[in-house]
Amino acid sequence: MAKSKFERTKPHVNVGTIGHVDHGKTTLTAAITTVLSSKFGGEAKAYDQIDAAPEEKARGITINTAHVEYETANRHYAHVDCPGHADYVKNMITGAAQMDGAILVVSAADGPMPQTREHILLARQVGVPYIIVFLNKCDMVDDAELLELVEMEVRELLSKYDFPGDDTPIIKGSAKLALEGDKGELGEGAILKLAEALDTYIPTPERAVDGAFLMPVEDVFSISGRGTVVTGRVERGIIKVGEEIEIVGLKPTLKTTCTGVEMFRKLLDQGQAGDNVGILLRGTKREEVERGQVLCKPGSIKPHTHFTAEVYVLSKDEGGRHTPFFNNYRPQFYFRTTDVTGAIELPKDKEMVMPGDNVSITVKLIAPIAMEEGLRFAIREGGRTVGAGVVAKIIE
């Protein structure tokens, strides 16, 4: 069966469901596809199709994730749903499924639970910019005051982790009713309200090509008579011949000019996000540039050595460590294209970190890396991956 061509007529947004186990994330995911497919086209997915999420590997870590797609009047959405709590932790930290916004599912019958809190914290740490709340199972709560109380609790919890709790859209409904075809305001009505909230509350994400130019350096060659060529894949933005660029990371920042862009042995006037290119640098010596640095628009990204991060430590079964690690553990941190050694400082209340844990840490690298909050990295020991992380806050 031929795959239908992906029509990119509507802007594309990535979302996902988060929240405590059994609060109805997967049922809601099924309900959204069912209601929206009948209204705007697309494919309805049954609960068990989503629940049997296939295994994927991201940075060597096995994650179960279900991917569904749906459309609203204005947009095309790609939506991820994970069966288990551990899958969420891994997914959010590795950035396997980058989210432009999340739908936090909270059971009105139970209120916020430990994983509700943990997922909000994770969303904050890994830089999920927007959260919309679906207050599920409202058909099981007769008491309007109780509903108000749960809503208030959720808003307070969001505010506690620096999300705008007072302004967050909270949609009351029942995913089960909607999935069963109930046309009332808790059923289909709630799903349509949720779709509207997604469209209006989550802004259309900036496309990679619109960002400030950034390219991780993969290789450096000198071509006699022409100068130094740096190769890599443009991560974001556009580079045009004649533009100034900076070389950032590992060594003091250098300024240079792009004098040529090559792709598949052809000369171009520009390279853009997604292109694998060679960039010719004016007056730069071969030994002044190395793998692990980045080429970027001047002033757009700075080198840092000291930061806090949220990390997931691989379990033994995933090929990770067999033993815990302690304060001042010094592994390699693999950023983009290179390893840099760094020392880990654990939180005051944590004596050690076990394989399979996730934890907030502070890291000091021995050499600076071009860094922004939200940058992903792997933690390695002798070339094998033992963890994955994301920069939460830059200290210096």
Curated annotation (Swiss-Prot):
Q: What class of enzyme is it?
A: hydrolase
Pfam families referenced in this protein's UniProt entry, alphabetically: GTP_EFTU (PF00009), GTP_EFTU_D2 (PF03144), GTP_EFTU_D3 (PF03143)
- Residue stretches making up the tr-type G domain: 10-206
Cellular compartments annotated = Cytoplasm
Positions contributing to Mg(2+) binding: 26
> Tell me, what does this protein do in biology?
GTP hydrolase that promotes the GTP-dependent binding of aminoacyl-tRNA to the A-site of ribosomes during protein biosynthesis.
NCBIfam families linked:
EF-Tu (TIGR00485), PRK00049.1 (NF000766), PRK12735.1 (NF009372), PRK12736.1 (NF009373), small_GTP (TIGR00231)
Name of this protein: Elongation factor Tu
What gene name is given for the protein in this entry? Answer: tuf
